[in-house]
A protein has these predicted regions:
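Short, low-complexity disordered leader/linker segments with a strong preference
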Residues: 1-39, 70-76, 103, 398-402
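Beta-alpha junction/loop-to-helix N-cap segments that form part of ligand/metal-binding clefts
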Residues: 24-32, 52-59, 71-143, 152, ...
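An alpha-beta-alpha
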Residues: 149-212, 230-231
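Extracellular/periplasmic bilobed ligand-binding domains
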Residues: 191-288
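Segments of small-molecule ligand-sensing domains
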Residues: 307-328, 338-391
């Protein structure tokens, strides 16, 4: 029955994707009153170095909310209210943001962009028995040992292997500089999986570390040149990405510069201009994929919805027709949340958690959704994107690894 309900939800979603409803993103559901309200917590960074990605995930969540602002529980309609907490891109501040959501009485949480904040907040959600649905946080530690944390995107062991295979087999980069942010869970974790797969393939990835907040990468670039590395892999934030690209090209380094899902952000192309050559990164989704029927409908509806509001446009990088792949992750996480609430016929966290564990929703934007025993989405698909003429464009597809 739970699976049937979820499938029906997906059908309703597909039929309604052409709609472009919405409201004030800062007051989503705030006008809901009475007992028939269910609160969904939005645990995302709107400040700090990951704010750009967090805002794009929130756009996906809010667009999904505009299409389905209510849920049905035991035959009665409940209004969804979105409750926001800024984790500030900081794992030290993330527990406070999580506690804010818990104290507000949310039934389920969505987020976050940035694995470190998810890892830091996870135990609080688990202790409070409030399920959380990760969006683009890819570190395995997010869900490991936490039966209340799920996620809709793929995880770093897969993503790291994809990018190592791409570097080694498609770009002939077998001796890579691995630039990571010291102490950052996402950067170190993702980099480690890239390094492991590169070594398995017969290549090498040498770690070059920098400190959080560092802006001068001249020492690292000098090492890249002197050691003759034929590729750079840099699993770093949006802000840092632009600096690494610009400083590498200014130093005369021409080798491919590669990364992961965080780089799927138009602001990187905007900030680096004609220096953004030979840039490649993995992503959850590509708007140019014409085989994705749900994706085509999403692109059409989301583009119109973003264009209707200046604040949405600003949070989307100032354009309506460019969609970061983390935005569909936000969308899919919201649909998973409301699907689980309806399948559970409850606003109680433990019941929603159990419904999530059994949930199957076909035809979401990043693919069919089903969770494994760890709460991770079962995914074996990724796209590779590049930057051309100031735009992020599709390059290739990975469907499984040998």
């Amino acid at each position: 029955m739970k699976k049937l309900i979820a499938m029906l939800l997906a059908l309703v979603m597909a039929l309604s994707l052409v709609a472009c409803g919405g409201g004030d993103s800062n007051t989503a559901g705030d006008d809901a009153t009475g007992d028939k309200v269910v609160k969904i917590g939005i645990f995302e960074p709107t400040s700090g170095q990951n704010a750009g990605g967090g805002k794009k995930e929130i756009l996906g969540i809010e667009y999904a909310y505009s299409l389905k602002p209510t849920v049905t529980i035991n035959g009665e309609e409940y209004a969804v209210q979105l409750v926001y907490a800024d984790n500030a891109s900081d794992s030290a501040k993330a527990p406070t943001a999580a506690q804010t959501l818990i104290s507000q009485g949310v039934s389920v949480v969505i987020g976050t962009y940035g694995s470190g904040c998810a890892i830091a907040a996870g135990p609080l959600f688990q202790d409070a028995k409030i399920p959380a649905i990760g969006t683009s946080c890819t570190n395995p530690q997010v869900t490991l040992g936490n039966d209340y944390y799920f996620r809709v995107g793929y995880i770093d062991p897969f993503q790291g292997a994809v990018m190592a295979n791409f570097a080694f087999n498609q770009k002939n980069s077998s001796n890579c500089a691995l630039i990571i942010e010291s102490g950052d869970d996402y950067s170190a974790g993702f980099g480690n999986y890239f390094q492991q797969e590169m070594e398995r393939l017969g290549g090498k990835a040498t770690v070059l570390e920098f400190q959080t907040g560092e802006t001068d990468f001249s020492t690292i670039m000098a090492s890249v040149k002197s050691e003759g590395y034929d590729g750079i892999f840099a699993p770093v934030s949006i802000e840092t990405a632009a600096m690494i690209i610009s400083q590498a090209r200014d130093a005369g380094i021409t080798c491919p510069i590669m990364a992961g899902d965080t780089w799927d952000d138009i602001s990187i192309a905007q900030r680096t201009g004609d220096k953004a050559t030979e840039i490649f990164f993995s992503a959850f989704f590509d708007a140019a994929d014409t085989t994705n029927e749900a994706g085509k409908a999403f692109v059409e509806g989301f583009t119109k919805w973003v264009a209707e509001d200046n604040a949405r446009l600003e949070n989307n990088g100032g354009v309506a027709d460019v969609i970061s792949s983390v935005t569909p992750c936000g969308y899919d996480a919201y649909m998973a949340a409301v699907g689980a609430i309806e399948a559970a016929n409850s606003t109680e966290g433990p019941a929603i958690r159990d419904a999530l564990a059994a949930l199957e929703i076909p035809g979401l934007i990043t693919g069919d959704l089903k969770f494994d025993e760890n709460g991770d989405a079962i995914k074996n698909y990724a796209v590779i994107k590049t930057i051309q003429d100031g735009q992020i464009v599709y390059f290739s597809t990975f469907n499984g690894l040998e």
